[in-house]
Amino acid sequence: MNEWLSQRADALARVTGVDRSALELSDEDAEHLLDLAAHAAHDSDARTNAPLLCYLVGVARTAGTPLDQLGETVRSTS
């Protein structure tokens, strides 16, 4: 995770009380999210859907479903 993103994760952990380690973003997860963001922007023809889809995936991820499975689900609805 780059420095800028790491600082935001630190701040979010402080404010929410979430364990900081839960906010770590692996390179693989970052790639999955960036791919999903690109998919949302291109598939919907609206760039604004990219961060919104990533938010929805993040909320869905709290149920414990792996990120790659969520990505497959999102892509299969296109």
Which residues does each PLM region occupy?
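Feature captures hydrophobic
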Residues: 1-78
